[in-house]
């Protein structure tokens, strides 16, 4: 997770993300897997951290696939469509997850297929996303209100150019919106239709600013194959404490119950001071001469007008209010303060 770099983003795109309808091409950075067969839910339920068996058609959840040692292979969003499950996850993890899922199939009626090349993915986010999606994607009498009231991870099927389009409610960047899964052959036409209706294309750097402000870890940036979910703070969203066994459960339960949830390090939010220069992913953290951790994601927040970051900090220094030293080569030492996340509360909260 070492990455000394400063992301560049568009302030105009950032405004659209918060005030209008922002369109992000996610086809390349997200992978898409499909599971079919009568046993698909029970099968996936036994592997992932969340309650897949309980998902009715039109519902979904956030989950993780772990090693037996409790380390993350990937996080993912799981959508039950009624006749199949669709999983979307970081593209870098997609093939490894597909292979691992396939390796566990014995006599179960399950087929796992990579649909990443056949199905494109667009993210549509912001307060105008539901209204705009309803105007472009046909669905009989369904209204924009019906889309706006769709619960998180819920899904509905619509059509575009006589092709099915799956809309999944999401908040990956801390801003409500939808993942739109569409036949790749009409992806370009869908993009143009959404833009013609009022959406504005944004880049991933702009979306990443909102993600960091929301305190959301991203796989490959803030989580990797060495991470235990409890270290990343995703347990409330990704882990069911009432379901049956899953791979890696023993480690998770041991930490939660015997260790009272204590892990050696935690992903926390930190704020710096304007004028001291940007915070960069990969910068080292110290406290009183002791190594304290490192930054994993960082940006200058347009709304706070201060540099902010996510990073892993030793549990001795992870409580809000701790002041840590930031060190990077021969640069002057600067300081950050540990704070609670999200850095910015979503509108209406």
Model-derived features: where do they sit?
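Acidic, proline/glycine-enriched N-terminal capping motif
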Residues: 1-62, 66, 71-75
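Acidic, low-complexity central loop/insert segments
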Residues: 22-24, 31-32, 77-217
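Residue-level signal for inorganic ion chemistry
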Residues: 37, 87, 124-126, 180, ...
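Short, conserved charged micro-motifs
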Residues: 39-44, 94-97, 129-133, 185-192, ...
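Glycine-rich, small/acidic residue-mixed loop/short-helix segments
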Residues: 227, 233-240, 246-249, 253-349
């Amino acid at each position: 997770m070492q990455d000394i770099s400063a992301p560049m983003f568009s302030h105009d795109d950032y405004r659209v993300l918060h005030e209008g309808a922002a369109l992000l091409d996610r086809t390349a950075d997200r992978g898409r897997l499909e599971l079919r067969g009568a046993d698909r839910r029970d099968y996936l339920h036994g592997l992932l951290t969340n309650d897949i068996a309980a998902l009715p058609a039109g519902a979904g959840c956030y989950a993780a696939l772990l090693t037996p040692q409790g380390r993350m292979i990937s996080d993912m969003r799981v959508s039950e469509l009624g006749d199949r499950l669709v999983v979307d996850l970081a593209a870098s993890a997609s093939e490894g997850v597909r292979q691992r899922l396939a390796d566990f199939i014995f006599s179960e009626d399950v087929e796992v297929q990579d649909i990443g090349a056949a199905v494109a993915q667009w993210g549509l986010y912001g307060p105008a996303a539901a209204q705009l999606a309803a105007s472009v994607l046909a669905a009989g009498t369904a209204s924009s209100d019906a889309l706006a009231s769709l619960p998180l991870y819920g899904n509905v099927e619509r059509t575009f150019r006589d092709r099915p389009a799956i809309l999944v409610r999401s908040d990956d960047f801390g801003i409500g919106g939808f993942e739109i899964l569409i036949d790749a052959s009409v992806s370009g036409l869908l993009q143009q239709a959404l833009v013609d209706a009022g959406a504005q294309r944004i880049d991933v750097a702009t979306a990443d600013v909102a993600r960091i402000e929301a305190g959301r870890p991203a796989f490959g940036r803030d989580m990797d194959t060495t991470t235990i979910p409890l270290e990343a703070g995703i347990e409330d969203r990704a882990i069911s404490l009432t379901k049956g066994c899953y791979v890696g459960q023993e480690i998770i339960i041991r930490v939660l119950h015997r260790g009272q949830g204590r892990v050696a390090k935690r992903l926390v939010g930190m704020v710096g001071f304007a004028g001291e220069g940007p915070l960069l992913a990969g910068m080292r953290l110290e406290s009183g001469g002791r190594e304290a951790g490192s930054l994993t994601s960082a940006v200058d927040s347009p709304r706070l007008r201060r540099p902010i970051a996510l990073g892993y900090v030793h549990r001795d220094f992870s409580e809000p209010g701790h002041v840590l030293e930031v060190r990077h080569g021969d640069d002057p030492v600067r300081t950050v303060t540990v704070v609670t996340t999200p850095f910015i509360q979503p509108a209406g909260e």
